């Protein structure tokens, strides 16, 4: 193996070990402007996009001890390395993909030490985020409380109006 390839292999191995997860993508019709915009959007979620040679990537995966299905990796291969939250990175990829007419295809991924197929990564990306789940829980808890307050308020106003009517009769 040439020295350049060995350095590239070491670099990819380091990125795999430093990341919380990664997403394997096939990209179609990607211009330089799309690539730059995609990379910029990923930087907001502590992730980066790399275009890699398949052989180098799968060799790095093998040396890191990961086993990802490589049967459907025809075409150009891109990898999103997520250094903070792999789910947020997957959501960002999905949002970008919707914006640019499905120019990215999920092939596989590794999120929270679980190997996932492309469909599974896409399903994870469609799940609500922790922030959204917290907001939904707060909404579920707040709704009954506001109803109780409303019922108590109407009951109290009924008692007050009854007392008011009694005092006006006398």
Swiss-Prot record:
Q: Classify the source by domain of life.
A: Bacteria
Q: Does the keyword Ribosomal protein apply?
A: yes
The record's section on SUPFAM superfamilies has: Ribosomal protein L10-like (SSF160369)
Q: Which GO terms describe its molecular function?
A: large ribosomal subunit rRNA binding; structural constituent of ribosome
One protein family per Pfam: Ribosomal_L10
Might you name a Gene Ontology BP term for this protein? translation
- Identify the NCBIfam families for this entry: PRK00099.1-1
- Full protein name: Large ribosomal subunit protein uL10
| UniProt organism field | Chlamydia abortus (strain DSM 27085 / S26/3)
Taxonomy, top ranks, is: Bacteria, Pseudomonadati, Chlamydiota, Chlamydiia, Chlamydiales
